[in-house]
Amino acid sequence: MKKSILFFFLSFTVLVNSQTEAIKYNNIQTDFFFGRPIEHDKKLKDAIDGNSYGILLSFNKINTKNTNFNKLYNYPERGFSFLYQNFNSDVLGEVFGGYRHYNYNLKNTSSSSLKLISGFGFGYVTKSYNAITNPNNHALGSKLLASAYLKLQFFQLLKKEKLSINTGVSLIHFSNIALKNPNLGINTVNLNVGFNYLLEPIKFQPLQEEITTNELDKKVYFNLILRGGYNESLEIDSGIFPFYTVTFYANKTINKFSDITFGTDYFKSEFLKNHIKNKNLEEGKTYNENDYARVGIFVGHELIQNNFSFVSQIGYTVYYPFPYVSRVYERFGLKYKLGKHLFSEVTMKINLFRAEALEIGLGYKF
């Protein structure tokens, strides 16, 4: 999952060819996919019975506003998509998903339509963990889930006036972000075949002005973010507790697409206090129940999307009084500029493959 997400962010750095056509089309696409869930934890062995399959229906609307953003990203499409997936497993069942997605045109030729599609939304699974009726489902602890997908579309089998058949690969992720355990999550790698139909043509005049690097503000800025939310420990039915995170970091713009970041996190997760207490009682440990704060340092990247940015970070916990999953952590999510100084964030903190928390944050840029 992490490698696929990192590939997603790095792929955007090759978007340098500008769109010169003056006609675009809204379109709909139906993808049929077939794949295999990834057994990233041995506890998933009894849940994964075989290959999964499903259908993804997408409604795509072209963005023709003459802005620097659209010119930089080759006039991307955006829209809504709906998914049905059958895990072909009595443990995992079926899942339905709804997403807001973005399509980025990496390359367009007569025989190739290289696109990168990212979708973020929610899912509903028919079978979740139950201690009595479904004890082997360590992937999904609740029926309501967070979900995301990445799709790389790279080859056209057929292209007519309005109809085309496209192939590609995709990665689909479901989890409940540690709001209810167990929560190993489920990731599926798929092969896709998509049928695309063009709707009404849209004529527009592409922006011709070039953007030079001299226009970029490459100063180093400092940022302070307060994050919070609720989550549960690894212990099933141990209850949800609030958590708080204070982040201070520096950022610098390096090109038209990217900022790099470096900073530190202070984590205060109330569930750890209860978790440490239980471990001391059950295993005879002597950890200090009141010493459960953690401190980490991280480096990161922000992919600039107008007022939005895609955030990716990898960090290491330097103050670690109690061992919990992993010292290494990752953070992925969205950042939105509210003004010159204020911004908001919605991010997912992950310890290796295991989601720890969905973070809601408010930040200030100095």
Language-model segments: residues:
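Residues that define the transmembrane beta-barrel architecture of outer-membrane proteins
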Residues: 24, 49-55, 74, 92-98, ...
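Residues on the lipid-exposed face of transmembrane beta-strands in outer-membrane beta-barrel proteins
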Residues: 30, 57-61, 100-104, 118-122, ...
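Repeated loop/turn-to-beta-strand initiation elements of outer-membrane beta-barrel proteins
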Residues: 66-69, 110-114, 158-165, 201-204, ...
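Transmembrane beta-barrel strands of outer-membrane/channel proteins
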Residues: 28-36, 82-84, 116-124, 167-173, ...
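Bacterial Sec-dependent N-terminal signal peptides
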Residues: 1-30, 114-116, 163, 195-199, ...
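Outer-membrane beta-barrel translocator domains and adjoining extracellular loop/strand segments
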Residues: 40-45, 91-94, 128-135, 177-184, ...
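Short glycine/proline- and aromatic-enriched beta-strand/turn motifs that initiate or cap beta-hairpins
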Residues: 19-67, 206-251, 365
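Outer-membrane beta-barrel "beta-signal"
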Residues: 37, 187-207, 355-366
